Structure formats: structure tokens, C-alpha cells
Swiss-Prot record:
Protein encoded by which gene: CAR11
Annotated positions binding Ca(2+) 2: 22, 27, 73-75
Organism: Arabidopsis thaliana
Function: Stimulates the GTPase/ATPase activities of Obg-like ATPases. Mediates the transient calcium-dependent interaction of PYR/PYL/RCAR abscisic acid (ABA) receptors with the plasma membrane and thus regulates ABA sensitivity.
Quaternary structure note: Binds to PYR/PYL/RCAR abscisic acid intracellular receptors in an ABA-independent manner, both at the plasma membrane and in the nucleus.
Record protein name field: Protein C2-DOMAIN ABA-RELATED 11
Gene Ontology process terms (BP): abscisic acid-activated signaling pathway; positive regulation of abscisic acid-activated signaling pathway; positive regulation of GTPase activity
Key words of the record: Abscisic acid signaling pathway, Acetylation, Calcium, Cell membrane, GTPase activation, Lipid-binding, Membrane, Metal-binding, Nucleus
Length: 166
């Protein structure tokens, strides 16, 4: 776990069918964690289907890393309410990044792997991992756990560390 495997660029795109935690709605935000790093989106007031389109950056060091996210409802006078959590193994993304170097995919868009929903993961819809003009990108919807409903859409891009030959 010494040298970085790359920069992980996580775009929190949107949420769908989030749970109500205030009187009629919620004020959601997302905290994304990778190892001991964490980052937070802005709060979207009074919305159960928020659109963030926020890019959060992390240093990927562990090939067995798991991306974790928690969704909260911002409250003014008391502790923020939990609106669910989800996690995503980054092993498929990392293996595709390694494969890309072996098969020398560099231009255009090529789907190299699919991740299917199953009881062992939080993936809610079929997810694709593609090589787009030399960059490895995963588009994924995650089902929120420990709540009645809710999904979060992410776009995850693994960027090679500086000095790496593509």
C-alpha cells in the first residue's frame, strides 16, 4: 500500500427517491470516504431527487479499496439525520485499469467489464466499466442500505499517477 495506484475522481451525480427526514422533504448531502480520506457534497435543500454533479478527488493506494458513502439530511438545530449508506468495491475498476495497459486500449470508448447487482453489493442497476479515450470510467447506481428507498448515481474515473505510461 505504498505507491498510489492513481487519482480516483468520484462525481456524485444525483440521488433518486431519497427518504423524507424532515416534515415533507429532506435537505440531503453525501459524504464519500476512501480509506482515511473523506469529502462532502453541498446540501440540496428541500429535495428527494437532488442533482449534485460534484467532483470529489481521492488518492487510491489500496488495490482492495472500498468506496463508502453516507447520505444525510442537514438539520439546523439538531444532529443531521441518516438517509442511508452504500459501498462499492473498487477491485473491478482497478483490474480493468490494469487490463487496459495489457490490451492497449487507448482511443474511442470500449466497455471492458460489467458489474451486476447482487445481494453481496449495493449496485442497483447493471454498471459498466469502460475505457474512454484511455481513461477508465465506471458509471454506477448504488442502492442505499438501512432505509426504505434511495439510490445514488456516481461516475468514477481512475486516473494514472503522474509519470505512468498509458
Amino acid at each position: 500500500m505504498g505507491e498510489p495506484l492513481g487519482l480516483l475522481q468520484v462525481t456524485v451525480i444525483q440521488g433518486k427517491k431519497l427518504v423524507i427526514r424532515d416534515f415533507k422533504s429532506s435537505d440531503p448531502y453525501v459524504i464519500v470516504k476512501l480509506g482515511n480520506e473523506s469529502a462532502k457534497t453541498k446540501v440540496i435543500n428541500n429535495c428527494l431527487n437532488p442533482v449534485w454533479n460534484e467532483e470529489l478527488n481521492f488518492t487510491l493506494k489500496d488495490p482492495a479499496a472500498v468506496l463508502a458513502l453516507e447520505v444525510f439530511d442537514k438539520d439546523r438545530f439538531k444532529a443531521d439525520d441518516k438517509m442511508g449508506h452504500a459501498s462499492l468495491s473498487l477491485q473491478p475498476l482497478i483490474s480493468v485499469a490494469r487490463l487496459r495497459h495489457v490490451v492497449r486500449v487507448s482511443s474511442g470508448e470500449t466497455t471492458l467489464r460489467k458489474v451486476l447487482p447482487d445481494p453481496e453489493n449495493c449496485v442497483s442497476r447493471e454498471s459498466t466499466i469502460s475505457c474512454i479515450d484511455g481513461e477508465v470510467v465506471q458509471s454506477v447506481w448504488l442502492r442505499l442500505c438501512a432505509v426504505e428507498s434511495g439510490e445514488i448515481e456516481l461516475k468514477i474515473k481512475l486516473i494514472d499517477p503522474p509519470g505512468t505510461n498509458k
